[in-house]
A protein has these predicted regions:
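Extended, subdomain-level signal for the structured scaffold at the beginning of enzyme domains
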Residues: 1-68, 76-88, 96-136
Length: 136
């Protein structure tokens, strides 16, 4: 269904759902992951089909060197997907301890290869010039 309820309880109608990306990763240039207050309940919902699909898509995009963009704890999810080995990630301070493969920084935003991350929504704008360059 395209009518979804986010982990944080927000209901919306999406243009499409993450499940439709599975197996179609080559048709897209990037994934943008918008985080928020949902991370504290991610573990409670990690086994849900939509989160399994999300992690599968993030892993596939990362392994193909496709662009992954996100803020807040997005870097943590990229790390959980196993695609951040040796990469610097700007993540929310509360997510820093969870980063095990990449390197969490205190930077407001950062670009390391195909990973574009910002500490939180206040700093997304600081990486946008770089995002726009690669998406042209």
């Amino acid at each position: 269904t395209k009518q979804i309820k986010t982990n944080s309880g927000v209901e919306l109608v999406a243009d499409d759902i993450i499940a439709h990306l599975v197996g179609h990763e080559d048709e897209f240039d990037a994934v943008v992951f918008s985080c928020g207050d949902a991370v504290p309940v991610f573990a409670q919902n990690a086994d849900k089909p939509y989160n399994i699909d999300l992690m599968s898509v993030l892993k596939a995009f990362g392994e193909k060197g496709k662009i992954l963009i996100g803020h807040c704890a997005a870097g943590m999810l990229f790390d959980f997907a196993g695609v951040t080995e040796g990469k610097k990630l700007a993540v929310h301070p509360l997510a820093k301890p969870a980063i095990t493969k990449g390197q969490a920084t205190d930077d407001k935003s950062g670009v390391d290869g195909h990973l574009f991350t910002a500490q939180d929504e206040k700093f997304v704008w600081t990486m946008m010039p770089e995002v726009l360059k690669v998406l042209k």
